[in-house]
């Protein structure tokens, strides 16, 4: 077999080995270079791709659409209101139908079990564009961004501050440990990662020679961090008292003081977006008026600083997703010997 990715789904980071994840990051970098030099790479010429969305999206939808087009494939957007998905037709039946017509399926939605069922019953590669538990394509983009800035991943220190139970915290914790990145999660005790996720990360960290720190002290979390990462304080679809969440997470806001607490002038600031860094959105304006705040998980001065790389991350979603689709569906020659 010339390509050990061929026909495989990408549902969560641990579906692949650390070496395979590292390969996909480098492959994404290569595809980004081809795009920058206007070199065609239609590895999926004639393929048809279903883009199945339960949740709204800017970056994921755009990245999958452009990546598919660049690869020569035909993407078809299917939102939950377009089809009978989960209402009048089961996930299993939908998977079988889509698998009979499409060569690959992207899913962005709520339950991890949904994307797992799509992969089990469709018979084609399925790619997780986001679920409540994992966000693997975002992680590839994030780590591509880290590698572009620092030249390597192993030995870097990344601190995530905020809601430690969400998909980004899970993915950063586990995938970072897999690739030898020292990971610190700074969250209040009530919002720290699930013990099973922490145990999994610790297992990978031990093998990779990296460290995992879970702490309720934001200053401890960010000490000597090469990268600070945060995400929205309330995830899409989550029913929560905003006032209580703000009270819990305000000490973990990325601001100039927390950035300075890293002790490094070279620290970069990351966010998967969208970000409530000002009041220029309907939600931001509403919350700002209600709670007397001008920013939430990250202040605008830090978001606009030279140390932020959030829009580089956003742009890297496309080559990262392109790498996953091409590797799993493109009949490429990828010698298995490089993974031994």
Swiss-Prot record:
Disulfide bonds: none annotated. The keyword Cytoplasm applies. It is found in: Cytoplasm. It comes from the Bacteria. GO terms for biological process: arginine biosynthetic process via ornithine; citrulline biosynthetic process; L-arginine biosynthetic process. GO terms for cellular component: cytoplasm. Gene3D superfamilies: Aspartate/ornithine carbamoyltransferase. Pathway: Amino-acid biosynthesis; L-arginine biosynthesis; L-arginine from L-ornithine and carbamoyl phosphate: step 1/3. Carbamoyl phosphate binds at residues 57-60, 84, 108, 135-138, 272-273, 317. Its main location: cytoplasm. L-ornithine binds at residues 167, 231, 235-236. Signal peptide: none annotated. It catalyses: carbamoyl phosphate + L-ornithine = L-citrulline + phosphate + H(+). Keywords: Amino-acid biosynthesis, Arginine biosynthesis, Cytoplasm, Transferase. NCBIfam families: orni_carb_tr, PRK00779.1. HAMAP family: OTCase. Belongs to the aspartate/ornithine carbamoyltransferase superfamily. OTCase family. This is Ornithine carbamoyltransferase. It comes from Lactiplantibacillus plantarum (strain ATCC BAA-793 / NCIMB 8826 / WCFS1) (Lactobacillus plantarum). The lineage of its organism: Bacteria, Bacillati, Bacillota, Bacilli, Lactobacillales.
């Amino acid at each position: 077999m010339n390509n050990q990715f061929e026909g495989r789904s990408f549902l969560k980071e641990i579906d692949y080995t650390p070496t395979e994840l590292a390969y996909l990051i480098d492959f994404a970098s290569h595809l980004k270079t081809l795009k920058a030099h206007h070199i065609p790479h239609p590895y999926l010429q004639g393929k048809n791709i279903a883009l199945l969305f339960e949740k709204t999206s800017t970056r994921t939808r755009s990245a999958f659409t452009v990546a598919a087009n660049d690869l020569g494939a035909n993407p078809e957007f299917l939102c939950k209101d377009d089809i009978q998905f989960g209402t009048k037709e089961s996930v299993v039946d939908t998977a079988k139908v889509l698998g009979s017509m499409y060569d690959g399926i992207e899913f962005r939605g709520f339950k991890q079990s949904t994307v797992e069922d799509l992969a089990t019953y469709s018979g084609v590669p399925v790619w997780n564009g986001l679920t409540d538990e994992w966000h693997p394509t975002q992680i590839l983009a994030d780590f591509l961004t880290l590698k572009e800035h620092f030249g390597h991943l192993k030995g870097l220190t990344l601190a995530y501050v905020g809601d430690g139970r969400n998909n980004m915290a899970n993915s950063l914790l586990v995938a970072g440990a897999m690739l030898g990145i020292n990971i610190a999660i700074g969250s209040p005790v009530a919002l720290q990662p699930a013990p099973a996720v922490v145990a999994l990360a610790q297992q990978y960290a031990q093998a990779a020679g990296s460290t995992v720190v879970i702490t309720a002290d934001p200053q401890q979390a960010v000490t000597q961090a090469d990268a600070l990462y945060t995400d929205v304080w309330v995830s899409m679809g989550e029913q929560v008292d905003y006032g209580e969440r703000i009270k819990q997470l305000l000490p973990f806001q990325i601001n100039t003081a927390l950035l300075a607490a890293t002790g490094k002038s070279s620290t970069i600031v990351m966010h998967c977006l969208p970000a409530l860094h000002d009041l220029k959105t309907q939600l931001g304006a509403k919350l700002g008026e209600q709670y007397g705040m001008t920013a939430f998980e990250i202040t605008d001065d830090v978001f606009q600083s030279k140390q932020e790389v959030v829009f580089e991350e956003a742009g890297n979603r496309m080559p990262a997703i392109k790498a996953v689709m091409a590797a799993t569906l493109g009949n490429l020659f990828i010698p298995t010997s490089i993974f031994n």
